[in-house]
Amino acid sequence: MGTVGFILAMWVVDGMGWTASNIQLYFGAAASVVLGIYAFTLPKCEIKKKNSSSLFEALGLDAFVLFKTPKMLVFFLFAILLGAALQITNAFGQEFLVSFNQFDEYKNSFGVLHPGIIMSISQISETLFILTIPFFLKKFGIKKVMLMAMMAWFLRFGLFSVGNPGAGVLLIILSNIVYGMAFDFFTISGSLFVEKETEDKIRSSAQGLFLMMTNGVGIILGGYFSGYVVDFYTQETVRNWSQIWMVFAGYSLVMGILFFFLFKHDHRPEDYNNGTFI
């Protein structure tokens, strides 16, 4: 449901003409206050009491023991690299479309006037691809599914490099559709993989570690890397988006090739029950 809210927010901001306005921030702040007040009306949840644990365990640091396992070490390292890819598209996807307003042939196109609606196709695709994860995980296993995600990132950026809001708008739309696979086939599948590969006592900490690698370390590194690349291909105020997206596409391709050779995992379909992990 969070993704549905994401889509609605993008449509509201776009429809109200707030794309380049700080009004969207005030709107978001007000909505957060209302949601926070509503949260106090929700039923109380019983908290399961656990046996006393050390501060080390309470902080979730016990999950770092997973780095001793080569397979999990490689997995978390690539979680960082994929988190960087996510930051790239989050930071520059919409700016890419808006930048075409400096060209007469594109400035009145739907993609330039309503970039939020065009980019929301990515989240719509995300809600659909998530339904396919049980089938793909059982059929192909985590390694091939994650490789699909990396190749989807390659297509995501590659299609951006040749697309535009005019005659090439279908390529932009296709890139947004591919995003659903790029995001879900790693973020959701990766979470399920962590669920299966970890013991009960550190499972919640392991999920937190996975989130930290993708949305923490990966986002930070992706911000620095993408910022450097974008600045490198910017002359005065004009960005060479084709070259920028090609660099990011190349990054995703190299990442996929390295993952293919470095990540060792034997898929066993019998580990799945009705498409989910036992």
Predicted feature residues:
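Pair of pore-lining "gating" transmembrane helices in MFS-fold secondary transporters
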Residues: 68-89, 177-178
